[in-house]
């Protein structure tokens, strides 16, 4: 878990981060990526003079990321800060290879299918909980029903008072991740003005794209009341697009029909989409340098000549 060391890593020159998640489900990916995205954004905001995001747009989450809620065997910084376990913690999960989960409560007493607990956390029907029994074996059970401080199970278990209990499956959290859990939007600014018989709308985005669309409008009537909020709302109806209105300069003292604003907005969004595609710089693969010399004339097992194809490449370059 490198989340607490991101600032030091960026200071050391790291600009690309890879999150391990082989064979993990979509919930794991959503949770962990979102957690690190927020952690990176905090570092970038703290040092805005040094760092900028490599991408544009901001994702709005429908959940609060928490690493402890995804598969883990507890956490360690590994060898990132020192060569021995920090704070006396082991670098391996010796008690169980399964996910330990988050500490959530302690058992007050247990009888039959009922366990009374002491906790400040909310537990829901369907949550998966685990514990170590008195023999050190890792055990688990599913909560069938919650009745105040009592957990009602589907079958009796033997668990001693004072036993710490962990949550390995948070049903409410998993439900939040199962649907659309994030929406990414690019912030845009809008400016509305009238000149020489033309009503104009300018949209500009975070990447510096700027477009203007106009409609013929010989004159505008004075408004009987402030039209600013209504005009801003009409321009900000961007559902179904990648955009989100951040700021708008409008003409609150003039009356502009909603249908005119709607058509102007639609035309402007289409033009901004086109500008996005035209100005996007796609990295191109460089042409192969056929006469590039191999790094060594004589190769060894350490150079990883894995098969006949890699052998052909090395030989073609002089090895």
Where are the regions that the model predicts?
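Surface-exposed amphipathic alpha-helical tracts and adjacent flexible/coil segments at the periphery
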Residues: 1-319
């Amino acid at each position: 878990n490198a989340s607490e060391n991101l600032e030091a890593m960026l200071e050391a020159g790291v600009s690309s981060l890879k999150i391990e998640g082989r064979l993990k489900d979509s919930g794991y990916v959503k949770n962990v990526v979102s957690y690190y995205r927020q952690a990176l954004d905090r570092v970038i905001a703290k040092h805005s003079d040094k760092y900028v995001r490599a991408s544009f747009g901001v994702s709005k989450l429908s959940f609060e990321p928490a690493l402890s809620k995804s598969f883990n065997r507890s956490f360690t910084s590994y060898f990132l800060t020192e060569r021995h376990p920090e704070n006396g913690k082991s670098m391996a999960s010796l008690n169980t290879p399964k996910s330990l989960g988050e500490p959530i409560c302690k058992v007050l007493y247990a009888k039959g299918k009922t366990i009374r607990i002491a906790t400040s956390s909310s537990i829901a029907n369907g949550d998966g909980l685990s514990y170590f029994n008195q023999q050190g074996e890792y055990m688990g059970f599913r909560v069938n029903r919650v009745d105040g401080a009592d957990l009602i199970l589907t079958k009796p278990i033997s668990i001693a008072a004072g036993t710490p209990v962990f949550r390995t499956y948070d049903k409410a959290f998993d439900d939040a991740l199962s649907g659309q859990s994030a929406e990414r939007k690019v912030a845009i600014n809008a400016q509305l003005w009238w000149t020489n018989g033309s009503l104009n709308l300018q949209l500009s985005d975070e990447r510096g794209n700027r477009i203007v669309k106009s409609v013929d409008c010989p004159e505008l009537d004075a408004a009987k009341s402030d039209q600013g909020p209504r005009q801003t709302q009409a321009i900000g109806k961007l559902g179904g697009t990648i955009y989100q209105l951040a700021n708008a300069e409008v003409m609150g003292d003039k009356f502009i029909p909603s249908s005119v604003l709607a058509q102007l907005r639609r035309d402007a969004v289409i033009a901004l989409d086109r500008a996005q595609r035209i100005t996007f710089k796609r990295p191109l693969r460089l042409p192969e340098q056929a006469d590039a010399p191999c790094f060594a004339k004589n190769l060894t097992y350490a150079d990883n000549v894995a098969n006949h194809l890699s052998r052909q490449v090395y030989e073609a370059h002089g090895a």
